[in-house]
């Protein structure tokens, strides 16, 4: 091994002072904005000195050049693997933290070698949860290999179902002939004449750093990867390791939920059951977020699950968005589903479906054992599947509100769209809806109807805890975005702000948010010092299939400058890039949150805010009332009652004891059902019942989580948080 080597680059104290902004005197415990430079790292390790020490090398990269490297040794005890892993993890994290603070940088990603991961199995988990670094694992060997990625030589990735998509063929080892270095006559008898070319640990670390950067795209976000047959390669096909320590998932739920998950996963693995999800987009919307999280969790459980999306079509997405708005009752009354649009929609889904039903596809014989179909973009698949595989269980999942009162009005746009969709949906084995009043038309047989809320992941970028260093990086990034678009900037941390995070959609009640804020400002006169009045932040990022966002965004800005010009300098309106941690930070640093949707599905963003300890003021629409306990974790108002919203805003902002009590209650009373683990348990239960046990469920409007907990022998315990099971009239 080479002698230990320390980082050589020296940070500039002048630049450090210039970039660091002053900490607010009113809130000295919160760091100010700091401009941090994005960086990447490569981390490698190897046992050295006759198994007595472990060498760790770290290479620093700025996306163009290798800028620095360090290597050091730590004691090695092969007989104490857990203690040894802890030593390596601590050393790596301390080294990266020290470099970050000294050089004013933020590590976004790190390449980790398989050899190192074997010695420290939870290193990736710690990098992700403790330092907000995306860890990407590479099988970098301690000797040189010859890449087969050449012209006319194709890498192939598996087209079979499964949560792991291999990344290519094994590369051959490069050997050299010792005769090239010395006289072969001087070699002893029986000595191997072809030897591998060794690769030092620092070379391995540098290789890992360079490979890691290739997985990041515009905006420094990990690239979305789609495999053959449009299988979504979640976490870069398994190369990104966010959570290797499954115990981290266990900590997010109660004992009953976790015991149920383990029992279900054991049965699915034993029976080798393959699960398939089919939805319209691989990123940008709530459904996509849930699918990424659930596939990641299933991979950790070693449950065989895969997720497929169709080829995107802008013309079809315009049709599906129109259908969505029509069903929710927020579209222009003159907007209708034309025959031309319906035919285009049908041909699009048929074309994609034929790829999946063809030999070797996920919906062909030998493919998935159960199919979960998401939302009104995909029901055209259902009759096609039934023709090819009539015995395959098909579960339809509806994530949106369907205005059952309008659906049954003869000749209405809602009736036309619903009849078109129901013609396909009726062939499914089960219809799953949000547990919300009047979300399901009466056409759906009650025996086929089951209830399940939406979910979010407490360990992904949207909801995990971010420390102050990472938080200030994302707040700085948001400031830069505002400057770039010439938008008002947040005064945080000197000034508080109130936030609504939602898509720019006609149903999100954004005009009501602005009006409520204006009323709140008037109430603040003589009650709150002018410098202490909070700002308003409206932000969100959109789905791939949402063409309305720009239209609504423009309308919001026009409204502010026309009707609320007095308060315009204190209102920040931003369409954010697709960075989960950015939205996480904006929520975590807000005083409290609003969610004034006029029509809504479940809107799990409410639970994300509560989980972060942020009281929420929201409207009684969709699934929002299920998540907020009025007067305890937030306030519920009628849609359009902006005066009541403003008064609650004033109470929360001026009564510190009330705020602290609500914040703590919100943080500690979020149900397992709205997290990935509880949600995954419901899907696993359906797979076990339909496939493993051959039971065709007749839920009659029951909650899937209730059926699952009863079947697993893990009934809800007294005091266990869960969504209210009051009188629901889901069908209208």
Swiss-Prot record:
Fetch the InterPro entries from UniProt.
Glyco_trans_1 (IPR001296), Trehalose_Metab_GTase (IPR052078), TreT_GT1 (IPR049438)
Q: In this entry, which stretches build a coiled coil? A: none
Listed under GO biological process in this entry are:
glucose 6-phosphate metabolic process; glucose metabolic process; trehalose metabolic process
Query: Any known activators or inhibitors?
Result: Activity abolished by 1 mM Cu(2+). 0.1 mM Cu(2+) reduces trehalose phosphorolysis to 76% and trehalose synthesis to 48% of maximum activity. 1 mM Zn(2+) abolishes trehalose synthesis, and reduces trehalose phosphorolysis to 40% of maximum activity. Unaffected by EDTA.
What UniProt keywords apply to this chain's record, in alphabetical order?
Carbohydrate metabolism, Glucose metabolism, Glycosyltransferase, Transferase
Q: What CDD domains does the record tag this protein with?
A: GT4_trehalose_phosphorylase (cd03792)
UniProt subunit comment: Homodimer.
Entry function = Reversibly catalyzes the synthesis and degradation of trehalose from glucose and alpha-D-glucose 1-phosphate. The equilibrium lies in the direction of trehalose synthesis.
What family does the Swiss-Prot or TrEMBL record give for this protein? Answer: Belongs to the glycosyltransferase group 1 family. Glycosyltransferase 4 subfamily.
Annotated protein name in UniProt: Trehalose phosphorylase
């Amino acid at each position: 091994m080479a002698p230990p080597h320390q980082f050589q680059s020296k940070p500039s104290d002048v630049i450090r002072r210039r970039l660091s902004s002053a900490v607010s005197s009113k809130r000295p415990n919160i760091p100010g904005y700091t401009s941090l430079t994005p960086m990447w790292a490569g981390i490698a390790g190897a046992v050295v000195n006759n198994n007595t020490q472990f060498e760790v090398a770290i290479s620093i990269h700025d996306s163009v050049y290798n800028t620095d490297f360090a290597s050091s040794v730590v004691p090695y005890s092969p007989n104490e693997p857990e203690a040894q892993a802890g030593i390596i993890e601590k050393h790596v994290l301390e080294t990266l933290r020290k470099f970050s603070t000294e050089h004013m940088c933020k590590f976004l990603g790190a390449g980790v070698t398989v050899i190192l991961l074997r010695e420290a199995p939870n290193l990736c988990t710690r990098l992700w949860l403790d330092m907000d670094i995306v860890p990407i694992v590479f099988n970098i060997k301690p000797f040189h290999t010859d890449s087969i990625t050449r012209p006319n030589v194709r890498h192939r990735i598996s087209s079979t179902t499964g949560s792991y998509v291999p990344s290519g063929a094994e590369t051959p080892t490069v050997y050299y002939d010792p005769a090239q270095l010395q006289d072969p006559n001087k070699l002893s008898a029986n000595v191997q004449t072809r030897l591998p070319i060794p690769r030092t640990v620092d070379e391995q670390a540098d290789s890992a750093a360079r490979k890691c950067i290739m997985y990041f795209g515009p905006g420094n976000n990990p690239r979305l990867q789609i495999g053959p047959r449009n299988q979504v390669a979640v976490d870069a096909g398994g190369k990104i390791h966010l959570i290797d320590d499954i115990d981290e998932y266990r900590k997010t739920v109660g004992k009953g939920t976790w015991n149920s998950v383990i029992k279900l996963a054991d049965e699915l693995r034993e029976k080798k059951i393959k699960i398939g999800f089919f939805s319209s987009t691989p990123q940008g919307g709530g459904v996509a977020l849930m699918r990424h999280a659930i596939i990641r969790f299933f991979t950790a459980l070693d449950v065989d699950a895969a997720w497929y999306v169709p080829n995107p079509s802008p013309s079809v997405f315009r049709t599906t968005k129109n259908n969505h708005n029509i069903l929710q009752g927020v579209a222009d009354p003159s907007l209708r589903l034309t025959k031309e649009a319906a035919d285009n929609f049908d041909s699009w889904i048929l074309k994609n479906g034929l790829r999946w039903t063809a030999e070797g596809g996920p919906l062909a014989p030998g493919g998935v054992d159960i199919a979960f179909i998401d939302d009104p973009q995909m029901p055209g698949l259902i009759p096609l599947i039934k023709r090819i595989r009539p015995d395959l269980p098909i579960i339809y999942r509806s994530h949106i509100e369907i205005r059952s009162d309008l659906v049954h009005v003869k000749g209405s746009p809602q009736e036309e769209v619903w009849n078109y969709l129901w013609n396909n949906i009726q062939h499914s084995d089960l219809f799953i809806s949000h547990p919300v009043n009047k979300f399901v038309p009466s056409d759906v047989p009650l025996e086929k109807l089951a209830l399940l809320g939406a979910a979010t992941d407490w360990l992904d970028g949207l909801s995990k805890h971010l420390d102050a260093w990472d938080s200030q990086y994302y707040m700085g990034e948001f400031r830069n975005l505002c400057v770039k678009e010439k938008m008002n900037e947040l005064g945080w941390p000197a000034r508080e702000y109130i936030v609504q995070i939602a898509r720019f959609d006609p149903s999100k009640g954004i005009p009501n948010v602005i009006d409520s804020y204006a009323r709140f400002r008037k109430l603040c006169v003589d009650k709150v010092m002018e410098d202490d009045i909070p700002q308003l932040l409206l932000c969100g990022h959109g789905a791939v299939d949402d063409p309305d966002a720009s239209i609504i965004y423009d309308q919001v800005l026009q409204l502010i400058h026309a009707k609320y010009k007095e308060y315009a300098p204190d209102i920040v309106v931003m369409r954010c890039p697709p960075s989960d941690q950015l939205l996480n930070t904006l929520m975590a640093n807000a005083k409290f949150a609003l969610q004034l949707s006029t029509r809504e599905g479940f809107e799990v963003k409410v639970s994300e805010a509560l989980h972060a300890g942020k009281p929420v003021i929201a409207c009684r629409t969709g699934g929002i009332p299920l998540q907020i306990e009025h007067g305890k974790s937030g306030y519920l108002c009628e849609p359009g009652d902006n005066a009541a919203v403003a008064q609650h805003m004033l109470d929360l902002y001026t009564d510190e004891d009330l705020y602290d009590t609500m914040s703590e209650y919100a943080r500690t009373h979020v149900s397992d059902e709205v997290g990935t683990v509880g949600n995954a348990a419901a899907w696993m239960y359906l797979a076990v019942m339909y496939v493993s046990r051959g039971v065709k469920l007749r839920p009659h409007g029951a909650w899937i989580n209730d059926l699952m907990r009863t079947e697993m022998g893990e009934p809800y315990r007294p005091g266990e948080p869960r969504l209210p099971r009051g009188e629901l009239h889901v069908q209208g």
